[in-house]
Amino acid sequence: MRILYICKSLPHRYQGGIQTHTSELAEHLTQRGHDISVLTAGSIRKGVQSYEMKGFTVIEAPYLPMRRFPFLPILLEELSFNVSAWLWLKKNQFKYDIVHLQGRSGFLFPKKHNETTVFTTFHGLIHLENKFSKQILNLDRRIHQRFASYFEKNAFKNSDAVISVSHEMQRELNQLKIQIEEKPRLIIPNGVAVKKSHNEGNTDIKSDNNTIIFVGRLDRIKGIFQLVKAMKKVDKNVKLVMLGDGMNRTELEEFIRTEGVSDRVELMGAQSNDNVLNWIKRGFALVLPSFHETQGIVLLEANTCGKAVAASNVGGVPEVVTHEYNGLLFNPYNIQEIADAINQLYRNPEMTKQMGENGRKLVAEKFNWSKIAADTEGVYKQVLASKKCKDELKLEVAL
């Protein structure tokens, strides 16, 4: 099959769950013999560029990065890429059997083309992310949320099939109550490249049984302030290393100083994927205190490295973390529960080690990319065959 993915950025430009998902799926479906391309954002100065990466073709469509623009920067950047993608697709859509949108990337395109079958994978919904972030939205973000919600509904309504990364994500989509004709709604989880659990990248990082790791963007929705506050109740020998960057970093740095835990909490900033994995392997466990997660890829990555996790009992997290099997679940709004989970993992190393091994087995069985690519391929074939039958039926009726 000729398949085009649309994703605003890829892991070699920006580290994130959607970016990793798109890259891994493209790579593994290429290995299964398909002709894969990924349409992503490129330089306005260079125009359309294409090159090979991991066996698939990357096509960069020129757009204007607007993050520094004084008014509506996020919305304008999103629109800039999607207009560029739409213009490119007007000329090139017929080259592909399937066009697969990742999140809101490409939302202008779906118009139920008979020649092209359109899929959309939903990784989250903007109104829920903002709701659970527990922060006051400024005017820019309120306007962005309104438009982004419309973009999501447009992609949902006009795609031939919709994929959710978890049962929780599918429940959230069902609550939108959009009046649409019946269409396939499928659940295919995110995965992890098991090979990446091997030692790569910075080999100078040594094991440290006193360090717990957080990986994620520094945003209130990730529960970062609750985590720092919980560190005051955690065993004094435990150190927290936080990997990632985000809009709340400056505020978090001041909060760490105010809470008096500067000697035990270290912000490392954004890291390469290899170094993230090595930091995970260094710690005794990983903690993710998010207020909302549709799945949580980093939990799978930690388990793949043989590490137990302490995570919020919210959203799609319980679909990948079974309490006291491959990690511990807690209420992210309860500071004491967060601290208790970290202390339990720290004070019971044999139990923590066994949870990590359980997690490694779980990921290998259910969340490896080879299996997910095969499942996705099967869904493509099923939807294409169904659409072909409908088209043939319409033709017979017309005749």
Residue map of PLM features:
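Membrane-proximal helix-turn-helix segments that form the acceptor-binding/catalytic region
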Residues: R142-V162
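Short hydrophobic beta-strand element within catalytic cores of glycosyltransferases
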Residues: A308-A311
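Nucleotide-activated donor-binding/catalytic signature segment of Leloir-type glycosyltransferases, i.e.
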Residues: E253-Q271
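Carbohydrate-associated surface elements
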Residues: E168, G191
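Conserved acidic donor-binding segment of nucleotide-sugar-dependent glycosyltransferases
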Residues: H323-E324, L328-I335, Q344-P349
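Aromatic "clamp/platform" in nucleotide-sugar-dependent glycosyltransferases that forms part
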Residues: F291
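Short alpha-helical donor nucleotide-sugar binding micro-motif in glycosyltransferases
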Residues: A270-Q271, N278-G283
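A conserved mid-protein helix/loop that constitutes part of the nucleotide-sugar donor-binding site
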Residues: T20, N210-K233, M247-E253, L328, ...
